[in-house]
A protein has these predicted regions:
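Terminus-proximal functional modules
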Residues: 1-74
Length: 74
């Protein structure tokens, strides 16, 4: 799925640790930045709110690479 420029810019402006992100295939994850770059952590179901799992579902060098791979803020 190709995201709109609006959605891509919203991601660039508002992304931060713990933000929920999604890709064009309907997969969700949590944004996590580290010294090694960006990690997208999986989502663990819970009774009230989704929480990050220990599973790393994707890694990126920077936000532009993340967006190019189809991940945007939800």
């Amino acid at each position: 799925m190709a995201w709109s420029e609006y959605k891509k810019n919203e991601t660039r402006e508002n992304i931060g640790p713990g933000a929920m992100v999604k890709n064009g295939m309907g997969q969700y994850g949590f944004f996590c930045d580290s010294d090694a770059g960006i990690k997208i952590l999986g989502v663990q179901p819970s009774e009230f709110l989704p929480v990050p799992s220990d599973e790393i579902v994707a890694t990126f060098v920077d936000i532009e690479q993340m967006i190019a791979a189809g991940w945007v803020i939800d």
